[in-house]
């Protein structure tokens, strides 16, 4: 359980995990933009799978911070 309450915006209720997902997505975009120029994707076998795993790891780290 998260310590944050459900947030209501314009009558729509959002669980706390929604904002954790958005935060991890923003960090993923930043990390992705930093990794592309380094050429690390030349060594990655499946870029879409790598991106998915990277996002899942970032989401896990963010969600552990807020619990």
From Swiss-Prot:
Q: Which InterPro entries match?
A: DUF1656
Query: Its topology with respect to the membrane?
Result: Multi-pass membrane protein
* Top-level taxon: Bacteria
Intracellular or extracellular location(s): Cell membrane
GO CC entries: plasma membrane
In terms of Pfam families, this protein maps to: DUF1656
Keyword check for Transmembrane helix, yes or no. yes
Alphabetic keyword roster: Cell membrane, Membrane, Transmembrane, Transmembrane helix
- The transmembrane residues are 3-23, 43-63
Give the main localization category: membrane
Q: Which family does it belong to?
A: Belongs to the AaeX family.
Which NCBIfam families does the entry mention?
Answer: PRK11594.1 (NF008615)
Q: State the protein's name.
A: Protein AaeX
Its source organism is Klebsiella pneumoniae (strain 342)
